[in-house]
A protein has these predicted regions:
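Short pre-active-site segment immediately N-terminal to redox-active cysteine/selenocysteine motifs
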Residues: 29, 36-39, 108
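Non-catalytic, surface beta->alpha helical segment in thiol-disulfide oxidoreductase systems
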Residues: 102-152
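A short beta-strand-turn-helix
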Residues: 7-31, 56
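Cofactor-binding loop segments of dinucleotide-utilizing enzymes, especially the Rossmann-like FAD-
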Residues: 35, 69-71
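Catalytic lobes of large eukaryotic enzymes
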Residues: 2-12, 56-62, 79-81, 86-88
Length: 154
């Protein structure tokens, strides 16, 4: 897996909350690439946890950018699912979706990879890293700091 290509495979124009956004990997120290789909029950279970993590991580300053790569079967599903997400997403039907799935040999979803902002793979099992530390009442700043510190040490 050639992780340095991640920043080249993500299209410059991504979908954000308020329309099209120009992608810049340097906007945060860490870049997460999240492969998921509306129709996938494990994804729908993990997405709220990741959203909570993302919001706590970025509360004071931007530490993490996430790019969603959809496996949704229709644009309606994609739009409904991305409507619940605070991060960026590759537009539905964009060729980058297949290119990213192929490059990272995605076998199943949800799949969450974490890179530094230069494209170096930091955590191939970022879903497990985030999910295994999920407290009952949601993430605290301390829990998130612990995970960020783990990633920073790599």
């Amino acid at each position: 897996m050639n992780s340095t290509i991640v920043v080249e495979l993500i299209p410059e124009d991504l979908k954000g909350k308020d329309g099209t956004v120009k992608f810049s990997p340097k906007d945060a120290p860490f870049l997460g690439v999240y492969f998921s789909a509306h129709w996938c029950p494990p994804c729908r279970g993990f997405t709220p946890k990741l959203k909570n993590f993302y919001e706590v991580a970025n509360k004071e300053k931007k530490q993490l950018e996430i790019v969603f790569v959809s496996s949704d079967r229709s644009e309606a599903e994609y739009n409904e699912y991305t409507g619940t997400m605070p991060w960026l997403s590759v537009p539905f039907g964009n060729e980058a979706i297949d290119n990213l799935n192929d490059a990272f040999e995605v076998q199943g979803i949800p799949y969450f990879l974490l890179f530094n902002n230069e494209g170096k793979l930091i955590d191939e099992k970022a879903r497990t890293t985030v999910e295994n530390r999920y407290p009952k009442n949601g993430y605290t700043e301390q829990t998130v700091k612990t995970i960020i510190d783990i990633w920073s040490s790599k």
